[in-house]
Amino acid sequence: LPVVVNPHGGPWARDSWGFNPEVQFLANRGYAVLQMNFRGSTGFGRKFTEIAYGKWGQTMQDDITDGVNWLIEKGIADPAKIAIYGGSYGGYATLQGIVKDPDLYACAVDYVGVSNLFSFLQTIPPYWKPMLDMMYEMVGNPEKDAQMLRENSPALNAERIKTPLLVVQGANDPRVNINESNQICLLYTSDAADEARSV
């Protein structure tokens, strides 16, 4: 089957059983949809949440890739017809997925996704400022963890992208600044492989 991988936002949130209109829309049109509660998702205990601290784009992303590979191994997914699509952290996971595993996905849709962990941490909304130290623990500290943040910022590794990509962003998004999308669009269109196109 063609598959749409749909990592949830947050990442400190979770997918749960119940009606989801986006998923139902895709399933109604013949797509299998993979949603997963990767490390860091809430509702599975403190340890499950905390093992994701400082692991954006790393083991959290590996959980998503492992799910996709499982679908391929079980014969559920057509390996040539796998898309990834998500918003907010799910948009980040979409971008990191096509950077880290450029041959895994046939296409990608990022909406309001973080593309540069440095600029994301610099532009958090005012109501998150009291939690900045906690954000540094959960995402990474720009001074102490600079190499890790650089390696896991899709915009700073856009030259690896070969996958056709659609980027969607609201101009006034209070949580994920429009600059996140501007960066990935600018770097993707200048550095991406010839066969990839941006919209």
Show where each model-derived region lies.
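Short amphipathic alpha-helix adjacent to the substrate-entry channel of hydrolases
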Residues: 18-35
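Acidic helix/loop microenvironments that form the catalytic cleft of cell-wall polysaccharide enzymes
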Residues: 9-11, 89-90
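Short beta->alpha connector loops of Rossmann-like oxidoreductase domains
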Residues: 13-14, 116
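Short beta-strand element of the alpha/beta-hydrolase
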Residues: 1-9
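Alpha-helix N-cap/helix-start motif
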Residues: 15-16, 177
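Serine-hydrolase catalytic-loop signature spanning alpha/beta hydrolases and amidase-signature enzymes
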Residues: 11-13, 33
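Active-site-proximal cap/loop segments of hydrolase catalytic domains
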Residues: 35-190, 197-198
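Active-site donor-sugar recognition loop in glycosyltransferases
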Residues: 11, 18, 40
